[in-house]
């Protein structure tokens, strides 16, 4: 899979809109910034596509990887040409074996983590946080966007 993919994940009260440009994208941030909420919305959609209150717009499938224990490699190898979202609770993302799976995969990976992942070859320009705008009372939608952790100051050096 190559190129940029525009993703919109939306429910009645929340909206995430972002672009995935490389095979590894990292989303970082403190607690309560919306990282796990994004995974939860994607999971809700994945588990009940027709009846889900979550709407996803994407030119490629979006999959949430959820617990396969020691079989994580076999499960990931079944997914092809998709954007795979993996939360930090999956500790295998810190292993060299995972880096090998990513390198040989046709998927893009979005990794939600607070820690550095030194075994993975990702670009500093693909490390994002989640910025929230909007009100937290009912009728108004809360809009989430990704922002780069390392900005243009590094590009000009």
PLM regions with names:
Residues 1-16, 137-153:
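N-terminal pre-Walker A segment at the start of P-loop NTPase domains
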Residues 31:
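The conserved Walker
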Residues 35:
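Conserved lysine of the Walker
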Residues 38-40:
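Post-Walker A alpha-helix
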Residues 44-55:
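Post-Walker A helix-loop "phosphate-sensing" segment adjacent to the P-loop in P-loop NTPases
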Residues 67-96:
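Conserved P-loop NTPase "ATPase switch" module shared by AAA+ and STAND
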Residues 102-131:
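Sensor-1/coupling segment of RecA-like P-loop NTPase cores
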Residues 121-147:
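A short helix-turn-beta junction within AAA+ P-loop NTPase domains corresponding to the substrate/partner-engaging
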């Amino acid at each position: 899979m190559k190129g940029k993919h525009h993703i919109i994940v939306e429910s009645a009260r929340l909206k995430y809109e972002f672009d995935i440009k490389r095979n590894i994208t990292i989303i970082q941030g403190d607690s309560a910034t919306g990282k796990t909420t994004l995974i939860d919305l994607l999971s809700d959609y994945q588990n009940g596509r027709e009846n889900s209150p979550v709407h996803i717009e994407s030119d490629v499938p979006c999959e949430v990887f959820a617990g396969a224990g020691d079989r994580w490699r076999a499960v990931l190898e079944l997914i092809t040409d998709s954007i795979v979202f993996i939360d930090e609770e999956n500790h295998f993302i810190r292993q060299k074996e995972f880096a090998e799976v990513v390198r040989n995969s046709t998927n893009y990976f979005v990794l939600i983590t607070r820690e550095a992942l030194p075994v993975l070859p990702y670009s500093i320009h693909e490390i994002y946080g989640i910025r929230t705008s909007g009100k937290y009372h009912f009728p108004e939608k809360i809009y989430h966007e990704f922002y780069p952790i390392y900005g243009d100051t590094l590009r000009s050096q």
